[in-house]
Amino acid sequence: MLRAIPRVANLEGYATGCKNALKETMYLSNWYDGGAVWNEFLMQRSFVSRYPVVKFQGCLGGYLGDAPGSMYFIEVKLNEFGEFFLFKHPAAFITIPYSLINGHYSHYTNILPHNLNEIIDALILLMNKPNASLDEILGIIKGPDFPFGCEIRINKEELYQIYMSGQGDIEILSHVLTNGSSVSISHYPPFIEEFGIDDYFDLKGFEQEFNGKFEKGDTVFHLQTNEPEALMKKMADSPILKRKVPIDFNFIVKREVKCVGIKRILSCFISNLQQQYAKRYEGCSPSEVNDMIIKEWEKIKSTFGDERRTTITIVK
């Protein structure tokens, strides 16, 4: 995708039609399933991807389930993140674990997105101290960080087990604001956009039972009723307010799909990166290679690092 968009647009910074970019992506990657490629494009929307590499122009749908427009009527171009890695600093793209910061979802794995600053700080820690404990790593990586913000409630021991084994479930909660007869729900759990909020909440039943009104915005869902407490009790178990999301750090290890912990993922990434830099810069000592890699990380962090959007609440 990164290489296809500028090839079709011909000039850096110009937008091109998604249909043309999709065809070029299929050609460069030898991928013949256009629907799957289009889904990969839609994964780069700002409310789905934590650090998208492209920017769209057109009707992209909404997080509450509104369908996107046709690819014929949507344009796409590289954003600052994508231009930095493709044009300004091509060597930097391999220096960060893209699947960890943006997440990766498939039949075999479910990696949730993480904060760029935290991942880079954990990489620097393991670079300088390879025998660092998982507790030290989790002192830096607080947990997943979603693009729309939300709240994660989890036990400290459960969080430790998830990142040690690479598998588990986390509970994600929306932000609910009650003001008199008005209830505003925002910062939803992830994957609501797959089906739409209508599939999780009976709007017609709400109007009849509570004699209320609803208003659906881009990111906020407003409910007007004279019985807000009864409404919240009925919605207590709704996926709109609370949802359990699985985590599976599945990777191919010696030709087998295995679930691995966060420390092994980061350590293997560092080892592979050191080998690549050693080949690229022959004659440099291991310490010089490490210094070059850390400088790349610091540059990426200072350019694109941001604050955590998801709140982590540790419960007993």
Where are the model-predicted features located?
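C-terminal interaction appendages of subunits in large macromolecular complexes
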Residues: H107-K316
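Catalytic phosphate-handling regions of large nucleic-acid enzymes and associated NTPases
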Residues: M1-G168
